[in-house]
Amino acid sequence: MEELIVELRLFLELLDHEYLTSTVREKKAVITNILLRIQSSKGFEIKEHVQKPEVANSLPAPPQMPLPEIPQQWLPPDNGPPPLPTSSLPEGYYEEAVPVSPGKAPEYITSNYDSDAMSSSYESYDEEEEDGKGKKMRHQWPSEEASMDLVKDAKICAFLLRKKRFGQWTKLLCVIKENKLLCYKSSKDQQPQMELLLNDCSITYIPKDSKKKKHELKISHQGADALVLAVQSKEQAEQWLKVIKDVCSNCTGTVDSDGPLSSSPVHKTELEKKLSSERPSSDGEGAVENGITTVCNGKEQVKRKKSSKTEAKGTVTKVTGKKITKIIGLGKKKPSTDEQTSSAEEDVPTCGYLNVLSNNRWRERWCRVKDNKLIFHKDRTDLKTHIVSIPLRGCEVIPGLDSKHPLTFRLLRNGQEVAVLEASSSEDMGRWIGMLLAETGSSTDPGALHYDYIDVEMTASVIQAAKQTFCFMNRRVISTNPYRGSTANGYACPSGMALHYDDVPCINGSFKGKKPPATANGITGKVRTLNSQPKKPESVSCVKRTASNAEQYKYGKNRVEAVAKRLQSKEEELLKRKEALRNRLAQLRKERKDLRAAIEVNAGRKTQVILEDKLKKLEEECKTKEAERVNLELELTEVKESLKKALAGGITLGLAIEPKSGTSSPQSPIFKHRTLENSPISSCDTSDTECSIPVNSAAALKRPPSSNNSPCRGHVLRKAKEWEMKNGT
């Protein structure tokens, strides 16, 4: 027993020179307490000194130096508390002593902060007061984190609380290495949960001003949510501020100061603008009043100083007023100068959301055109910073990417792809294409581009929106005042290209009167060019689309024309097949009728069986042909609908394809206008009548067909009659 006690004492002495975890230290303290009680009860203290040389001789490797003195913590409790360690202590770690009863050694409750069991309310911070009257700071004992790889080469590390999205708090191990802030969920993790670059950032210290608040450090990055960390005391906050200032000494940061002692009045103005325009952060917002702000470039550190009671009262009033102003400003946000647009920009906005292809991923970005540049922003509310800016001069606009993204268009410079953009609708795509064509300085007609992945109807919508935006943007470049200029209504055609806006032919071929009448959209039917001269009257003549001169007003839409021609040829082929089927069915029905009559005549004879077999085969063939005829009718109806859409879009596209009489679209706009030309109304000479006004293409397409000329009634009655005749036979 004596040898065991001596060996145990030596083992405990060796453990004194080793690094122990909190669990091992607790066990060591328990064993030491038991050993002291055994020694005091059996009186082994004297015997140990007598037998110590003998035991030492029995050891295989006796120590060459005398054993160290017994530490104070092994002595009875009457000798005093255990000594304090001299090693450096990490932040956020302490051991709390529990009151001891007589005859017992002190026990320690170790807090290693490695679990999420800690409450998000963080009440221990709320109970602290800065004055510290009658209180002593808790001593921080060393922890196992001090020798981990996580904190190696770290400038500072501590367990801090991070403010979450809905005001809750979560505990993280925060470490600053080089120029990064690494946040670990636990000291056992090898990968950080969050990594934040301290370049170009601003850090703000917000002291605790009530029991519901904490000492907070707010780290802000442009274009990202602020990171809010809670520290235990003002001293700890100053340490972190100093370290971050040293880390960012070679970087440029933004100033987020609200103090009256700021070195430049511009900083205060910028902060007030930011407070009035920024949205509430997901990590929570804290006011900067009575705070300390450190600029990341290390050149400036603004501190608020307490002054007299009068100044304190004025500060409180100022803080209250700012809070009220901020609450009111959340509902009514005054747009910044970047967000404000002129009245001309409101008509055709030069900004909007687009999907941008970046690193094989589609991301939604707020895009706007300004000063011949396409600027990408992360969000609509963040216009002070941009992700990338692309100069548009010299670029080429090409619609289409693949069939999965039909509303895509690309920007090319010298054959190299600069940007791939996707719109949300055909109108939006046309607006952006027209806008980019105008800003790039291109003389390409929006209708001359090839739209390979969208159908005819959508192509018409894209081209119409592109041409309107194209003319509008060029009109803004030519005339600073949209209501004053040499062109009609401020519209002009770029690079000497004639603008084909009204594609519907003018009735009777000319206008009567000195002034050309305006269309429904306020755009004159007379088309001018930038370099229009009196010597060339054909450049300013009105657009007249008839069968003779339709070829010269084509928009280069070879693909759309090919589709329409293909549909027409397919319709003709289906009509021929339908006619052949109809003749064959009529022949089969006649043969069937004759066979039935022959069976009635030859009833009871041997030939009746042969005739019945022929009748069965004939019935089967009739059913097959009838099913084929029904499928043919369905296919023909579908082709007619497609052809009708193609011919309706031909007005906007300027196609030289005309509907055939008696085919799918007898009520197409071209057919209607030809009817009007042959009607008595076309011979009227008054300039104020509706027949002499050129019709806008969009209005003509949106106009519902007249109920008097409905082509469906006779067709339905004819089909019903055919089915009745078939069922009757």
Curated annotation (Swiss-Prot):
Coiled coil feature spans: 557-648
Tissues of expression: Isoform 2 is specifically expressed in brain.
Region of interest (Interaction with F-actin), residue spans: 594-637
Region annotated Disordered, chain positions: 56-91, 112-139, 257-291, 701-729
Motif SH2-binding 1, residue range(s) on this chain: 94-97
One BP term from GO: peptidyl-tyrosine phosphorylation
Annotated GO CC locations: actin filament; cytosol; plasma membrane; stress fiber
GO molecular function, one term: SH2 domain binding
Superkingdom of source: Eukaryota
CDD domains per the UniProt record, alphabetical: PH1_AFAP (cd13306), PH2_AFAP (cd13307)
Motif SH3-binding: where in chain: 71-74
Pfam families assigned to the protein according to its UniProt record, in alphabetical order: PH
PANTHER family membership: ACTIN FILAMENT-ASSOCIATED PROTEIN 1, ACTIN FILAMENT-ASSOCIATED PROTEIN 1 FAMILY MEMBER
Name of this protein: Actin filament-associated protein 1
Gene that specifies this protein: AFAP1
